[in-house]
């Protein structure tokens, strides 16, 4: 046996037996053992290695967020072990439009070439259609380089390019497997993950920091929320009786630690082939009844159509979906796209995706971090998800870069509390705008909501700052929550002014008052969920000023 083979054999045996003989070894072992890459629960062949030895960071999920994080941390010299459930090319109907603000973050990460060879299409803004009228809303890109614009593409092609670029780095080990649970030390610190490989073997992986970014259907989200901690505290107190059960039912956030996912609607996805958009290089938003319809190009020959269906129930694809699309939706499609839309329905391949929304409610867990859609979701109407995720990756990279030793979990956790505050300008602006616009653009029988919807379209049609300001917010180019609130209420008061002029009446004054109340009722719950203080007064929070732990 060669010297290298003997060392590898001894290394694997050592890490197999130490946990069995000394269950608490993680608390006393040196950093190399605490961050061991894999402790085998049975005799299994080694996974493909991008590097030998211990990992500094485990990344769960290799989507947009996970791949970008692995790449940027590895470029900084961190050893990253990526565990992804399925390394085949994803086939999704969302995550296909990257806003200009997100493209700027790609440039910061050095990943802008990932959109160069996938037939990605430049996006220069939006066109709104409503009741036979249309208005063009270009992105305010005058101050940026000519290459800066939005991009639309096949999500799977984009993700595969990012995975390939990350996996090519020496310090990235990318492995296919399903993470089933987080490994905890003393029910306090997360020290790694347990996962199942594609051939069914159960393995454990250890690292000082585990970053969960396994998407909107994350099965680890609740693990970081620790609902059993709340429940366990009640059990230990001896006060578990009927009144406690009632309070848990009445206040589920206490039990579920605020990890609630709302599904306000679903997208029905189609691909239109070999057709021309009325305005090339623009996203098309039809303000239809009952809710918006989107069109945007995802390749030189394909146009994505997303039909929003509000509520938790949608017609079944096999029985009623085609009839619904032809009877209810087709008549509201622009004439230039109607034939291609009907042809796409006849071809089949109709896809449905629930539109999830979840405000970010962090539970600070030493050794673990939640990012991407696993951490924070908003309605995909505005296409802001990837922009928020990439912005978070840039911020997290900059925060971790000066940290020399990741093994001090409690100090690192306390320092990374600043992440949740510093991300708020970009994330809360896009999240709030997405939720508010969806509610404003959806049809309602209420007169005040109808007036607010019409006022929003007419306000954006004014052009200049009235369209440029909101579009800069939506695109991630101007992440200022206060600017968002000012524009939103400017729309409301614009609607009131139109209603009262030239001759106000008592009835119109009443509707005008209800418009303002309606606007407040739409935006305030979203802002409250995001955190009023975090959005508008982040510098008043001590975590904003956290310094990195001493080396």
Predicted regions and their residues:
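C-terminal helical "tail/cap" subdomain of flavin- and related membrane-associated enzymes
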Residues: 24, 398-551
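FAD/FMN-dependent oxidoreductases across multiple families
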Residues: 35-36, 246, 313-420
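Conserved N-terminal helical subregion
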Residues: 52-54, 104, 113-235, 249-254, ...
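Conserved phosphate-binding and hydrolysis motifs of nucleotide-dependent enzymes
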Residues: 61-66, 215, 372, 385
């Amino acid at each position: 046996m060669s010297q290298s083979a003997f060392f590898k054999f001894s290394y694997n045996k050592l890490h197999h037996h130490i946990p069995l003989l000394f269950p608490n070894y993680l608390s006393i072992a040196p950093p190399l053992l605490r961050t061991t890459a894999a402790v085998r629960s049975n005799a299994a062949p080694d996974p493909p290695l991008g590097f030998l030895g211990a990992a500094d960071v485990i990344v769960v999920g290799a989507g947009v967020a996970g791949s970008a994080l692995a790449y940027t941390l590895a470029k900084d010299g961190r050893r990253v072990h990526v565990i992804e459930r399925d390394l085949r090319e994803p086939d999704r109907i969302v995550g296909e439009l990257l806003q200009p603000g997100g493209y700027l973050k790609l440039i910061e990460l050095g990943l802008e070439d990932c959109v160069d060879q996938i037939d990605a299409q430049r996006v220069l803004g939006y066109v709104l259609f409503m009741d036979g009228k249309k208005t063009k809303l270009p992105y305010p890109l005058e101050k940026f380089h000519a290459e800066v614009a939005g991009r639309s593409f096949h999500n799977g092609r984009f993700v595969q390019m990012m995975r390939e670029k990350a996996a090519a780095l020496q310090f990235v080990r990318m492995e296919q497997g399903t993470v089933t649970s987080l490994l905890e030390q003393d029910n306090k610190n997360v020290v790694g993950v347990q996962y199942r490989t594609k051939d069914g073997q159960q393995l454990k992986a250890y690292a000082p920091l585990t970053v969960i970014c396994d998407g909107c259907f994350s099965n680890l989200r609740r693990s970081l929320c620790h609902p059993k901690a709340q429940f366990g505290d009640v059990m230990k107190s001896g006060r578990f009786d009927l009144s406690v059960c009632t309070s848990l039912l009445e206040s589920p956030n206490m039990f579920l630690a605020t990890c609630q996912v709302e599904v306000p609607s679903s997208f029905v996805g189609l691909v239109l082939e070999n057709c021309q958009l009325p305005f090339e290089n623009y996203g098309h938003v039809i303000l239809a009844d009952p809710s918006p319809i989107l069109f945007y190009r995802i390749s030189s020959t394909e146009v994505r159509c997303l039909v929003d269906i509000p509520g938790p129930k949608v017609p079944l694809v096999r029985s009623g979906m085609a009839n619904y699309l032809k009877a209810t939706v087709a008549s509201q499609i622009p004439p230039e796209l109607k034939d291609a839309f009907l042809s796409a329905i006849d071809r089949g391949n109709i896809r449905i995706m629930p539109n999830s929304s979840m405000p970010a409610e962090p539970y600070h867990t030493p050794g673990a971090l939640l990012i991407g859609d696993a951490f924070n979701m908003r309605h995909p109407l505005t296409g802001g998800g990837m922009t928020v995720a990439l912005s978070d990756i840039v911020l997290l990279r900059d925060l971790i870069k000066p940290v020399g030793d990741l093994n001090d979990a409690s100090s690192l956790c306390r320092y990374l509390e600043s992440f949740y505050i510093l991300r708020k300008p970009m994330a809360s602006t896009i999240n709030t705008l997405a939720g508010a616009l969806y509610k404003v653009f959806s049809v309602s029988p209420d007169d005040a909501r109808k007036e607010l919807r019409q006022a929003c379209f007419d306000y954006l049609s004014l052009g200049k700052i009235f369209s440029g300001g909101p579009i800069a917010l939506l695109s991630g180019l101007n992440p200022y929550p206060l600017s968002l609130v000012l524009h939103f209420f400017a729309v409301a008061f614009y609607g009131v002014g139109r209603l009262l002029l030239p001759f106000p009446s008592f009835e119109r004054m009443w509707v005008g008052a209800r418009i303002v109340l309606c606007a407040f009722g739409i935006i305030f719950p979203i802002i409250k969920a995001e955190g009023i203080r975090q959005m508008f007064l982040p510098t008043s929070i001590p975590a904003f000023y956290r310094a990195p732990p001493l080396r």
